[in-house]
Amino acid sequence: MPIGVPKVPFRSPGEEDASWVDIYNRLYRERLLFLGQEVDSEISNQLIGLMIYLSIEDDTQDLYLFINSPGGWVIPGVALYDTMQFVQPDVHTICMGSAASMGSFILVGGEITKRLAFPHARVMIHQPAGSFSEVATGEFILEVGELLKLRETLTRVYVQRTGKPVWVVSEDMERDVFMSATEAQAYGIVDLVAVE
């Protein structure tokens, strides 16, 4: 029997009685954000809106983004990454479960020294993919060109934020490279591994 999203009591400052709000709403008020699905425009826009709102509300308190994502669409993921760099508060990224593909790109985008993985987390990097079925030749060439630009952008960010040489990141992005939490730390995707 599905129970839906759990509700928890929350008392707004100055109010006597607590009201019941869904757990994510309560956690957002504590500046705790969650990416627990495939990255698409909807979740990306929701997280971007929350980051901007919380940044306007108080730009001195850090934000915490918990990630358990199989990856997803490149453009919405890059938009989320750019927002993380844009907002004034530091964004801590925490990998729990897995951060694959675009999930690992968002993970590496956290404030350097404030990127963490749980001990049994898994991280995977690879190159962006496109779908070229039933595409005319001219469009195919344009799409390949755009895909190469996106790959170049992602590679540049991984190089900048991990400290790895371009040739290492480029070679690793040629295929799916899976890493444990400690391997992701050695690679420079995260800075810390939580203690068991």
Curated annotation (Swiss-Prot):
PROSITE patterns named in the record: CLP_PROTEASE_HIS, CLP_PROTEASE_SER
Location (main, coarse): plastid
Pfam families xref list: CLP_protease
Subcellular location: Plastid, Chloroplast stroma
GO CC terms, sorted: chloroplast stroma
Domain of life: Eukaryota
Class of enzymatic activity (EC top level): hydrolase
GO molecular function: ATP-dependent peptidase activity; serine-type endopeptidase activity
Keyword Plastid recorded: yes
One biological process term in Gene Ontology: proteolysis
Keyword entries, A-Z: Chloroplast, Hydrolase, Plastid, Protease, Serine protease
Disulfide cross-links: none
EC code: 3.4.21.92
Residues at the catalytic site: S101, H126
Catalyzed reactions per annotation: Hydrolysis of proteins to small peptides in the presence of ATP and magnesium. alpha-casein is the usual test substrate. In the absence of ATP, only oligopeptides shorter than five residues are hydrolyzed (such as succinyl-Leu-Tyr-|-NHMec, and Leu-Tyr-Leu-|-Tyr-Trp, in which cleavage of the -Tyr-|-Leu- and -Tyr-|-Trp bonds also occurs)
Assembly description: Component of the chloroplastic Clp protease core complex.
Cited function: Cleaves peptides in various proteins in a process that requires ATP hydrolysis. Has a chymotrypsin-like activity. Plays a major role in the degradation of misfolded proteins.
Stated family: Belongs to the peptidase S14 family.
Protein's name according to its UniProt entry: ATP-dependent Clp protease proteolytic subunit
Gene that encodes the chain: clpP
